[in-house]
Regions:
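Catalytic-site/binding-pocket detector for metal-dependent nucleotidyl cyclases
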Residues: 105-106
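Short beta-strand edge/capping elements of PAS-family sensory modules
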Residues: 9-10, 28, 76-79, 93, ...
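Residues at or immediately flanking beta-strands
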Residues: 29, 59-61, 135-139
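A short, well-structured catalytic beta-strand-centered motif of the EAL phosphodiesterase domain
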Residues: 64-99, 118-119, 139, 143-145
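Cyclic nucleotide signaling catalytic output domains
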Residues: 1-25, 31-46, 50, 96, ...
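Catalytic core regions of nucleotide second-messenger enzymes
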Residues: 4-7, 23, 90, 126-136
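Helix C-cap/alpha-to-beta connector motif
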Residues: 113-142
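Short, basic/aromatic recognition patches
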Residues: 43-65
Length: 149
């Protein structure tokens, strides 16, 4: 106790951080408070704020992974993949920002943006295709939250 906090309020905040870290580690786990937990929390809060700004400010990008028909060599569809080139952190991996979006509720705005952007791109590809060429479908993975909202 004495090394973890100087007063009761701080001790309780630190205990909460340790409890959430234990929950994140899985059922039946425990964690002792470590100063790195506070830094990790502040980093997640900053990343959430930055993600909200990125969605509103057009910082996100969609990359497309093609699905190719091996028999013909033609692209039959493409999967839209959200990428985030953060201005100071560099490329933030989806495994890092998608859970934050889900926990914060930003996943609905993120999904809406991805659907709108993928539809715009699909329309552009459709207008640019050669006469008689087959259309290319576009797939977008969305969260269950997106469907409910």
């Amino acid at each position: 106790y004495p090394q973890d906090a100087a007063d009761t309020a701080t001790l309780l905040r630190h205990a909460d951080l340790a409890m959430y870290a234990a929950k994140q580690a899985g059922k039946g786990r425990y964690r002792r408070y470590a100063h790195s937990m506070q830094a990790a929390l502040l980093d997640r809060i900053a990343l959430e704020r930055d993600l909200e700004r990125a969605i509103a400010g057009g910082e996100l990008r969609l990359h497309y992974q093609p699905l190719v028909d091996l028999a013909t060599g033609r692209i039959v569809s493409a999967e839209a993949l959200v990428r985030w080139p953060h201005p100071t952190r560099g490329m933030v991996p989806p495994a890092e920002f998608i859970p934050i979006a889900e926990r914060s509720g930003l996943v609905v705005a993120l999904g809406r943006w991805a659907l709108d952007e993928a539809c715009r791109q699909a329309a552009a590809w459709s207008h640019a295709r050669a006469p008689g060429a087959p259309r290319v479908g576009v797939g977008v993975n969305v969260s269950g939250w997106q469907i409910q909202h």
